[in-house]
Amino acid sequence: MARIPGRPDYDALIKLLLVGDSGVGKSCLLLRFTDDMFTSSFITTIGIDFKIKKVDVDGKLVKLQIWDTAGQERFRTITSAYYRGAQGIILVYDITDEASFNNVRNWMRNIEQHASDNVNKILVGNKLDLAEDKRVVSIARGQALADEFGFRFYETSAKDNVHVEEAFIAVAKDVLARMEGEHANQQLLQQQQLSAAQPVRLTSGSPSPAQGKSCCR
């Protein structure tokens, strides 16, 4: 169906945030998803970077604005402001790096402190292509942590393009479903408020209180 001129060329705009330790592959995941490219010579993100991609989510055209945050401690104050506007958060660790997995709890504390209470989140264990020789975090441990927090869980490889799109689409679906539910609830509330505000009118045939039967005999 043709879009009306002057209106957005998408059905929904969703802001996603990639967080996790430096070096876990957040920028590589973003580049693979948005541009279907991979490079092993990424320079560590300085501050904030973002890309945009439009995707089909359950028949709706969704514009994803995906923000890639720096993982180093000295940039935490910069990235904290971006939590507040995020509708979905992808929390990434490196399956070959125990410290990055342990730090997931620290990132969760940041999310709980700065992000909206209803923000959708998923957990991603990246660098699956190195699993055979260098894995130190098992699938079971990753899944157990995701279950503890109530997250979806994916293991991905930006290099081999494994489960990358599925992870981004999954969080986008969760956000879209929540947004639609909130919109429906808001419409219902407005209808209820409108109904409550309508005055009650008596028809001409309705007896007034004075015309009722007297309790006196």
From Swiss-Prot:
Protein location: Cell membrane
Gene Ontology CC, one term: plasma membrane
Region entry Disordered, spans: 198-217
Keywords recorded for this protein, A-Z: Cell membrane, GTP-binding, Lipoprotein, Membrane, Nucleotide-binding, Prenylation, Protein transport, Transport
Extent of Polar residues compositional bias: 201-211
Protein purpose: Protein transport. Probably involved in vesicular traffic.
Family to which the UniProt record says this protein belongs: Belongs to the small GTPase superfamily. Rab family.
Protein name per its UniProtKB record: GTP-binding protein yptV2
Organism, as annotated: Volvox carteri (Green alga)
Gene: YPTV2
